[in-house]
């Protein structure tokens, strides 16, 4: 663990993340956040920083899959619930879904259509990375369709060169670390 108490959250993330050249293909410089989440101090600091941005929410919505880890930790910190925004086909019916476009195809996000009342609730969406913005935009649209008031989103890392903020505009996004 290389973070020190009082260290800037971006520095904590940068110091703990692993950089993997040429993954998943040549020329890509992959930023692996797994070591940040596996480090007790790193997880605690990231969770606290996200919780600070999500204060006032009735519910946090963690996006499949690492958003689940972050969302759960943040919900406990804030004393509120967490909703798992799942990849398609993982929840029993009935579900509400939102399909979005990927580079080579499409994907779907889902939430329960009943059993969890979302109408009128103030929700902050939590995910690990903002890249092109497709997943975050779909989560926002899905939760809005379910009647939630999505007040913002928080991501651990933003890949600014991929322009994800434009895809989620006008949703307010807080990023703890940008590259």
UniProtKB/Swiss-Prot annotation:
InterPro entries: Ade_phspho_trans, PRibTrfase_dom, PRTase-like, UPRTase/APRTase. Pathway: Purine metabolism; AMP biosynthesis via salvage pathway; AMP from adenine: step 1/1. It is an enzyme of class 2 (transferase). Its EC number is 2.4.2.7. It comes from Mycolicibacterium gilvum (strain PYR-GCK). NCBIfam families: PRK02304.1-5. This is Adenine phosphoribosyltransferase. GO terms for molecular function: adenine binding; adenine phosphoribosyltransferase activity; AMP binding.
């Amino acid at each position: 663990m290389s973070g020190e108490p009082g260290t800037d959250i971006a520095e904590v993330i940068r110091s703990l993340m692993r950089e993997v050249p040429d993954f998943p293909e040549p020329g890509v410089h992959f930023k692996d956040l797994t070591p940040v989440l596996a480090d007790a101090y790193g997880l605690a600091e990231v969770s606290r920083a996200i919780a600070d941005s999500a204060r006032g929410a009735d519910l946090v919505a963690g996006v499949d899959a690492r958003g689940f880890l972050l969302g759960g930790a943040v919900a406990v910190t804030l004393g509120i619930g967490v909703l798992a925004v799942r990849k398609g086909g993982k929840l029993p019916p009935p579900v509400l879904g939102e399909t979005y476009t990927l580079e080579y195809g499409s994907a779907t996000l889902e939430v329960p259509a009943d059993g969890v009342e979302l109408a009128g609730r103030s929700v902050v969406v939590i995910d690990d990375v903002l890249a092109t913005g497709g997943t975050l935009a779909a989560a926002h649209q899905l939760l809005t369709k379910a009647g939630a008031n999505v007040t913002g989103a928080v991501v651990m890392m933003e890949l600014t060169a991929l322009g994800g903020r434009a895809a989620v505009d006008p949703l307010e996004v807080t990023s703890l670390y940008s590259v």
